[in-house]
């Protein structure tokens, strides 16, 4: 009767230590994560982290501000989560690492939104108030999205470039660089967007393919005698002909003022059916084929001999307004890669053209600049007045043809500049702007801005390292920075300029401070409503308010001034330890911040720059609406959990492109489950363990427990090294291996027998639990920076009296004597175990055994392996998870092998081992002697496993 009862309900009669935990197997992340976000906010977890970190060394990751417009996208998620991992890992490494999020609030996109909603005729004051309200609304929307991703920070007190104090400090920063002499006003070709009606920064320009007419145009001889002399001829063989240029911008022809030749390139005078043509000698054959002409070279001369010759404008015969000549200027930038080796120069529409004409004595008033800010020619331009330049292109080609100047016209697809906001083509256009001079030597420093910035690049640590050369090249080759913009919603360049000379008021620095004080109280609206007489009295008769606003890259580029040392100086400090953004920011925020700090402080505003790549789909394609391959982080968070996004980001090498697809997310989810299952096992088997009451001293632990803790401590050292270098994907890879192989596939697998079958309060079981306690402490802390929701959920089960895992620092594992030798020894044992597992699998496949516990093995080993195996004594069988194990000594590695035999004994009902002593106690015929002792006597004695 009793036996039958025991058989039907063995757990009741012969219980094992199978424990449970409130930490569930299923994460149910989409449901639980929002609860954690709410709880973190309600309980002030970020503030608790700050309190716990107070007094530690500071680590400042300065947040590059996203633009306050639109929903967050996957790129935002990558950026914010990487920052969150850095900040959390630095806090846990023993630093005081605050995170102050920020937003970029001024500029064109918001102004466009206001125009769309309310029209273009709003008074400036209304534009301002509506823009502020719109930006505030967008910030709140984005803030919810970032919090949902598990990002902790000072969300209640972010910085905003539109906050009055920040606007005021930007004006003060402008004053600083004026005081040092960097700022000047000048006419220069700048990137100009017709839709924006404003200059653009380099970072606001993108390149896309565009098809334009490409034309070869002849400028007729104006000085035939001088031209003949230049070629060493007594006279030109015929009067017809001229010099030939090639261009992809016909719209610039009406503004032509010069021609450029390379001084050392040899030019040929070619006799053709269209007259004498001057072309670079090495381009003659290609050009004749393109023009469908036959030609004979009459004479040659280097470019230097042709300098200052003049040629008629190609539209001279079409309209008297073009009856002018263009001189030849020499330029090293002319090449013979394409075209004719001759460049036509419209100085108002090209930087090199402008510089060349300036160098040859042209003044600002000499430049022909017929294109207005909206992309149309001035009405007075002959033939094409009032036309859009793009509409004028074909008409100009036709006019050139009628004038007899056109040699060839074709369609040409090329990479061309576009506005990053409007996606429309832009041009270089000479306008009067305020610039920061790259090669200006300031009043208080012997280095130019370019030199100081390049030194700043050299002093900065780059992650990955290739970023250094990229930024260095950009700084080395960039033109002067166009600081001014022609918009309303922006920080004003609050100058008073002389109505006739354009000079700044002599009290400009003092006046800027007065304006800044007003802006600090009332915002940039204070400048809009300011009557000049309030500040400059009767000087208002001679001086007027400058209407330009600052480039928004100056807004964000001076956050090291108006945030780190301004609005949030109590939390932050200068320079920042790290700026972390996408790789496009080498020409954006990294770049503008470097220039402003180099001007203000003579150094970079950061010690390190971390760059991440862009997101692509599973096939490596960029995400776009047209491809329909975009991934919405909000949708993924609601379907799979933000934790899956966090794990995907942490496990991907962010230095390149970050690929995402359903298949990739599926793999990430599987990896997450393995980690979660490991945590569940640890927590369940610690649910009856009280460290204060049950902990076993280190020197009394079983050997495998000492090994597990020593191994985990060694791994943690590696992981912290990766964290310190911002290498997150090796952290994830090693932790996944640790959970699935080192713990799940080995240590926890071996431990199950001891945890489940040893006496509940035995030294052997408490030794295992003590080790698991330390492992859990260590594991949760190294997981917390990226698996934040899960680590917190597990932590609250593990340490319910503690506020949060995020106030902890990385775990100090107990010292294990002889840990290095122990790790080496168990590496050998695990290697042998792998061979035994393989032999057991082969025996199972051959139907010689069922489970591994049905087997008895004999391990033939030599040398160190033999010594390691025999040192375990009878505990070897627990490590191999067999019912019996013996070791046979052999001479060398070649003789090593594993013999597997099925046990001839009965299976214990409780521990499932096959043992000779099953049934040795008549009252318990299905129980082995080991289980009998563990249940009813003093329990078995183990030393190793």
UniProtKB/Swiss-Prot annotation:
It comes from the Bacteria. L-isoleucyl-5'-AMP binds at residue 581. GO terms for cellular component: cytosol. ATP binds at residue 625. Its EC number is 6.1.1.5. Its cofactor is Zn(2+). Zn(2+) binds at residues 908, 911, 928, 931. GO terms for biological process: isoleucyl-tRNA aminoacylation. A motif ('KMSKS' region) lies at residues 622-626. One of its GO terms (molecular function) is tRNA binding. Keywords: Aminoacyl-tRNA synthetase, ATP-binding, Cytoplasm, Ligase, Metal-binding, Nucleotide-binding, Protein biosynthesis, Zinc. Its main location: cytoplasm. It is found in: Cytoplasm. The keyword Nucleotide-binding applies. It is an enzyme of class 6 (ligase). Binds 1 zinc ion per subunit. A motif ('HIGH' region) lies at residues 66-76. It catalyses: tRNA(Ile) + L-isoleucine + ATP = L-isoleucyl-tRNA(Ile) + AMP + diphosphate. Belongs to the class-I aminoacyl-tRNA synthetase family. IleS type 1 subfamily. NCBIfam families: ileS (TIGR00392). Catalyzes the attachment of isoleucine to tRNA(Ile). As IleRS can inadvertently accommodate and process structurally similar amino acids such as valine, to avoid such errors it has two additional distinct tRNA(Ile)-dependent editing activities. One activity is designated as 'pretransfer' editing and involves the hydrolysis of activated Val-AMP. The other activity is designated 'posttransfer' editing and involves deacylation of mischarged Val-tRNA(Ile). IleRS has two distinct active sites: one for aminoacylation and one for editing. The misactivated valine is translocated from the active site to the editing site, which sterically excludes the correctly activated isoleucine. The single editing site contains two valyl binding pockets, one specific for each substrate (Val-AMP or Val-tRNA(Ile)). Monomer. This is Isoleucine--tRNA ligase. It comes from Burkholderia ambifaria (strain MC40-6).
């Amino acid at each position: 009767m009793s036996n039958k009862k025991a058989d039907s309900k063995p757990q009741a009669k012969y219980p094992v230590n199978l424990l449970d935990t409130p930490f569930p197997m299923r994460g149910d992340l989409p449901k639980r994560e929002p609860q954690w976000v709410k709880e973190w906010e309600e309980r002030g977890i970020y503030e608790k982290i700050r309190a716990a970190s107070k007094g530690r060394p500071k680590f400042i990751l300065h947040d590059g501000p996203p633009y306050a417009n639109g929903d967050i996208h996957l790129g935002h998620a990558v950026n914010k989560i990487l920052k969150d991992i850095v900040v959390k890992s630095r806090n846990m490494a023993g630093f005081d690492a605050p995170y102050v999020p920020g937003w970029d609030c001024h500029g064109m996109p918001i102004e466009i939104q206001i125009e769309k909603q309310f029209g273009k005729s709003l008074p400036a004051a209304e534009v301002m108030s509506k823009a502020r309200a719109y930006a505030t609304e967008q910030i709140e929307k984005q803030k919810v999205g970032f919090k949902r991703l598990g990002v902790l920070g000072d969300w209640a007190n972010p910085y905003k470039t539109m906050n009055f104090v920040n606007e005021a400090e930007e004006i003060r920063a402008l004053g600083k660089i004026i005081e040092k002499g960097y700022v000047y006003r000048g006419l220069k070709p700048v990137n100009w967007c017709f839709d924006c009606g404003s200059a653009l920064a380099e970072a606001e320009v993108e390149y896309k393919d565009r098809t334009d007419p490409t034309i070869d145009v002849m400028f007729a001889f104006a000085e035939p005698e001088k031209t003949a002399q230049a070629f060493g001829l007594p006279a030109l063989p015929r009067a017809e002909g001229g010099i030939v240029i090639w261009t992809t911008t016909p719209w610039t022809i009406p503004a032509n003022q010069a021609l450029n030749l390379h001084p050392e390139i040899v030019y040929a005078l070619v006799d053709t059916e269209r007259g004498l043509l001057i072309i670079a000698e090495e381009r003659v054959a290609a050009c004749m084929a393109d023009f469908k002409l036959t030609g004979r070279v009459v004479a040659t001369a280097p470019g230097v001999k042709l300098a200052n010759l003049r040629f008629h404008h190609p539209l001279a015969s079409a309209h008297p307004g073009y009856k002018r000549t263009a001189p030849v200027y020499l330029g090293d930038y002319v090449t013979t890669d394409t075209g004719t080796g001759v460049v036509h120069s419209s100085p108002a529409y090209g930087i090199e053209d402008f510089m060349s004409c300036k160098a040859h004595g042209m003044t600002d008033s000499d430049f022909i600049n017929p294109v207005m800010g909206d992309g149309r020619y001035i009405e007075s331009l002959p033939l094409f007045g009032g036309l859009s330049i793009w509409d004028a292109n074909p008409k100009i080609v036709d006019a050139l043809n009628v004038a007899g100047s056109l040699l060839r016209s074709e369609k040409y697809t090329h990479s061309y500049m576009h506005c990053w906001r409007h996606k429309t083509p832009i041009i270089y256009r000479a306008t009067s702007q305020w610039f920061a001079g790259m090669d200006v030597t300031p009043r208080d420093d012997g280095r130019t801005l370019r030199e100081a910035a390049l030194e700043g690049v050299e002093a900065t640590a780059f992650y990955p390292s290739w970023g250094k050369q990229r930024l260095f090249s950009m700084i080395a080759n960039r033109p002067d920075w166009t600081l001014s913009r022609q918009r309303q919603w922006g920080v004003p360049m609050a100058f008073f300029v002389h109505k006739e000379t354009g000079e700044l008021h002599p009290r400009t620095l003092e006046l800027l401070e007065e304006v800044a004080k007003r802006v600090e109280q009332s915002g940039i609206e204070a400048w809009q409503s300011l009557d000049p007489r309030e500040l400059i009295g009767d000087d208002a008769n001679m001086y007027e308010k400058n209407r330009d606003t600052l480039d928004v890259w100056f807004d964000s580029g001076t956050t090291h001034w108006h945030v780190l040392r301004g609005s949030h100086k109590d939390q932050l400090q200068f320079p920042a330890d790290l700026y972390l953004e996408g790789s496009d920011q080498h020409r954006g925020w990294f770049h503008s911040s470097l220039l402003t700090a180099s001007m203000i402080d003579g150094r970079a505003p950061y010690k390190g720059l971390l760059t991440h790549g862009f997101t692509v789909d599973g096939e490596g394609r960029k995400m776009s609406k047209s491809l329909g391959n975009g991934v919405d982080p909000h949708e993924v968070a609601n379907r799979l959990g933000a934790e899956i996004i966090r794990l995907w980001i942490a496990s991907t090498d962010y230095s390149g492109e970050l690929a995402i697809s359903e298949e990739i997310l599926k793999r990430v989810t599987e990896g997450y489950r393995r980690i979660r299952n490991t945590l569940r096992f640890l927590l369940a088997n610690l649910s009856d363990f009280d460290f204060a009451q049950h902990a076993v001293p280190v020197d009394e632990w079983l050997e495998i427990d000492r090994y597990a803790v020593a191994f985990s401590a060694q791994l943690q050292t590696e992981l912290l090294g990766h964290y310190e270098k911002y290498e997150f994907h090796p952290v994830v890879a090693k932790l996944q291996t640790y959970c699935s192989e080192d713990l799940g596939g080995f240590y926890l697998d071996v431990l199950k027998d001891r945890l489940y079958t040893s006496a509940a309060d035995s030294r052997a079981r408490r030794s295992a639990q003590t080790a698991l306690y330390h492992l859990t402490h260590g594991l949760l802390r190294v997981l917390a920076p990226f698996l934040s929701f899960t680590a917190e959920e597990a932590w609250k089960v593990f340490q319910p009296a503690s506020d949060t895992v995020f106030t902890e620092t990385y775990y100090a594992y107990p010292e294990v004597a002889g840990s290095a030798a122990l790790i080496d020894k168990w590496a050998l044992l695990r290697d042998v175990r792998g061979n035994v597992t393989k032999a057991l699998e082969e025996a199972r496949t051959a139907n010689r055994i069922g489970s591994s516990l049905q087997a008895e093995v004999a391990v033939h080993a030599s040398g160190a392996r033999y010594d390691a195996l025999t040192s375990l004594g009878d505990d070897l069988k627990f490590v191999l998870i067999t019912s019996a194990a013996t070791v046979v000594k052999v001479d060398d590695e070649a003789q090593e092998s594993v013999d597997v035999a099925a046990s001839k004994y009965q299976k214990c009902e409780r521990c499932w081992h096959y043992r000779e002593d099953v049934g040795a106690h008549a009252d318990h015929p299905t129980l082995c002697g080991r289980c009998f002792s563990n249940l009813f006597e003093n329990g078995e004695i183990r030393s190793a496993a």
